[in-house]
Design a protein with these regions (language model features):
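Short, structured interface segments
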Residues: 1-6, 28, 63-97
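Long, polar low-complexity repeats
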Residues: 2-48, 103-247
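Short, polar loop motifs at secondary-structure junctions
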Residues: 41, 60-62
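Intrinsically disordered, low-complexity effector regions of RNA-metabolism proteins
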Residues: 98-102
Length: 247
């Protein structure tokens, strides 16, 4: 986490003070161990979903009865913890500097991709299985995963995907990726950050329950739908930062 001054670090942070904040609908089950949930706007739960965390902090109201943990409504706002973190901002600033080719594959085919070859992609349309080597990947446009598609990395390989479009997952698609660590980061991967995007549109991490992400998912301008597997912890955790978040 780039801002160590926050006492109980958020695993889920919605930054827009005038928007939807954090919402939970349907049967979503969110268990944040050792970290908090924070919205600069409201936090609301509905349906049969449950949420538990070390604390719930909101710039306005907290509504719904299915929250397990201390509630802190009208607790003010916090700033973007990565707004001045140069590794992330420098990477985002490179998007659009070169268009690059599009990636398309076929169901049932496994394709390895190597960081920097090419440096920029225009989009990824994944129908089969894509396996990433360690490093950073720039995708100027959208990333889409079709039914039963998968996006993963080599064992112990830390990756960062920097993208300018939206991410969508269909059906039984799976993403299994981990960010690099400060001890081991190769080929430009940003330690701790697995996804960074600058789109103002809505991305959806709503694939198969096998989806597992370790690191920060950073979409400061866009809305994120994070289904089924939303989880976090103190070690090897998932941290989600976006304009607004639906669980």
């Amino acid at each position: 986490w780039a801002d160590a001054s926050i006492a109980v670090q958020p695993c889920v942070l919605a930054m827009d003070s005038g928007g939807a904040g954090i919402t939970s609908q349907g049967n979503a089950s969110v268990n944040l161990t050792g970290c908090s949930m924070r919205s600069n706007a409201a936090i609301s739960t509905g349906g049969s979903g449950t949420m538990s965390a070390a604390g719930f902090y909101a710039g306005s109201s907290i509504t719904g009865s299915e929250t397990g943990g201390p509630l802190f409504p009208y607790d003010g706002t916090i700033s973007d913890p990565y707004a001045h973190y140069s590794p992330v901002q420098d990477a985002l600033s490179q998007l659009g500097s070169s268009s690059g080719p599009a990636f398309n594959d076929k169901p049932g085919v496994t394709t390895p991709l190597v960081s920097g070859i090419p440096k920029f992609w225009s989009k990824w349309d994944i129908q089969g299985s894509v396996v990433l080597s360690p490093g950073i990947y720039y995708v100027n446009g959208d990333i889409s995963l079709g039914d039963s598609a998968s996006l993963s990395s080599l064992s112990s390989a830390g990756v960062t995907i920097v993208m300018g479009g939206v991410l969508t997952m269909r059906g039984g698609s799976i993403i299994s990726l981990s960010a690099a660590t400060k001890a081991v980061y190769l080929n430009g991967a940003i330690p701790g950050v697995v996804f960074a995007g600058n789109s103002s549109n809505r991305s959806s991490f709503n694939g198969n329950t096998g989806t597992k992400l370790t690191g920060v998912v950073y979409y400061p301008n866009g809305a994120l739908d994070f289904g089924g597997t939303s989880q976090g912890g103190t070690t090897g955790c998932l941290e989600v930062i976006a304009r607004s978040i639906q669980l």
